[in-house]
Regions:
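Accessory terminal regions of nucleic-acid processing enzymes
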Residues: 1-182
Length: 182
C-alpha cells in the first residue's frame, strides 16, 4: 500500500486530497471562466428541489445558466492528455442535469480547468433525462430512508467512521499537494 495504510484508508486519503485540490483551484477557474466567456458568475448556495433532492452548483452565470467546475488532479502537472468530454463522464452529466433542475435553469456551463488548459461545454437541460431518472432517484431516496430508519438494516449499509492516516508516505503526498496549491 503506497501510503503505508490499509487499502480502503489509502483510497479515502487519495479522494480527500483530490477533492481538496479541486476546491483549492475553483476560485482561479471561476476567474478564468469569466475572462474566457465574458459572463459574470454569482456565488450561490444549495438549491432544494421538493423536500428530498438538492444541488449546489459552483455558481450561477449571467446568461441564466449554472456553472460546474472540475479541476482534475490528473492534470495538475500539465500532462498533455486532453480533458474527457462530458459525454464520457456520465456522473457529471447527471450532476449538471440535477443542478439545472434544482436551480430552475435551462443550461449549464461545464468547465474543466487546469493552469495549462481548459475545456468549456454548454449543456442544455435534458427533460427526457429528468423524466427518466428523477422517479428512480425518488424511489432510491425513499428506500434509503426506510433503511436508515432500521438500526439493523442501517448497520449493513452505513460506512464506519474513517481512520486517520498518519504515515510518512501520506505526509509526502501532502507536501506535494501543498506545493501544487501555492
Amino acid at each position: 500500500d503506497a501510503l503505508g495504510a490499509p487499502r480502503e484508508d489509502e483510497n479515502q486519503f487519495l479522494e480527500d486530497v483530490i477533492f481538496g485540490y479541486g476546491k483549492m483551484h475553483e476560485p482561479g477557474a471561476v476567474l478564468d471562466f469569466q475572462m474566457d466567456t465574458g459572463l459574470n458568475v454569482i456565488e450561490c448556495g444549495f438549491f432544494a428541489y421538493d423536500d428530498w433532492l438538492g444541488a449546489s452548483p459552483d455558481g450561477l452565470t449571467s446568461d441564466g445558466g449554472v456553472l460546474e467546475i472540475k479541476a482534475p488532479w490528473s492534470r495538475r502537472k500539465g500532462q498533455e492528455r486532453e480533458f474527457k468530454s462530458l459525454a464520457d463522464q456520465p456522473q457529471y452529466y447527471a450532476q449538471v442535469q440535477i443542478e439545472m433542475l434544482c436551480a430552475g435553469r435551462q443550461k449549464a456551463h461545464f468547465y474543466q480547468y487546469s493552469s495549462h488548459a481548459q475545456l468549456h461545454e454548454v449543456v442544455p437541460l435534458d427533460q427526457a433525462w429528468i423524466d427518466e431518472n428523477i422517479p428512480r432517484l425518488r424511489q432510491f431516496h425513499a428506500e434509503f430512508l426506510d433503511i436508515i430508519a432500521s438500526p439493523d438494516m442501517a448497520a449493513d449499509y452505513l460506512a464506519p467512521k474513517r481512520v486517520i492516516i498518519d504515515t510518512p508516505e501520506a505526509h509526502k503526498m501532502m507536501v506535494e499537494y501543498d506545493e501544487l496549491t501555492q
